[in-house]
Amino acid sequence: IARMGQWAENVYFGKPCGLMDQLASSTGGLVFMDFRDPAAPLVRRLDAALPGYVLCVVDSGADHAGLTDAYAAIPRELGAVCRLFGAEVLRQVEEAEFYRRLPEARRAAGDRAVLRAIHFLGDNERVSRQVAALNAGDFDEFKRLVVESGHSSFEYLQNVYAACDVEFQGLSLALALAQRALDGCGAWRVHGGGFGGTRAN
């Protein structure tokens, strides 16, 4: 089901998306995924009790129209970083090696690509800590890491608004309002591919 969903987005809608959202939707619940082998990702449903908490996916009202190029730039730029390391995906790149060769990566792929890679490498490590927090029943730590991931996405992945349309930032505003409402008691972050659309609270 997930691969069919990815095909529909790639071919029918022309969006060069990966498989993460489709795998999460087809599996259901909280899901751990590892894409070290893109042809056979590891998918494990997490058994976490979250009493008193609700996951809300909020429509920010932002429009995705005309933003395919902004979205497509992410895998294209990350691909340039991967090629430098002889990797198919960033999950196959060791973080220490990436930072050791950072000047080379900047020359090969550009600063925005390097910042985006920093987000992905950080999120790969952050996911392990999120799973550990859930397994330990430490939901406060899990929420903190969700917010940390969201800030990394905004600052380094740069997928909350498109540089070609800075006047309209519905998702940025939605995230600011979510932080105002939930700070100290909840978590929030961009959801999906970004550039408008939804946030998860």
Predicted regions, residues:
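Aromatic side chains
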Residues: 12-13, 71, 195
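C-terminal nucleotide
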Residues: 24, 29-189, 201
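Glycine-rich, mobile lid/loop segments that gate access to catalytic sites or pores
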Residues: 1-22
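N-terminal pre-core extensions flanking Radical SAM catalytic domains
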Residues: 196-200
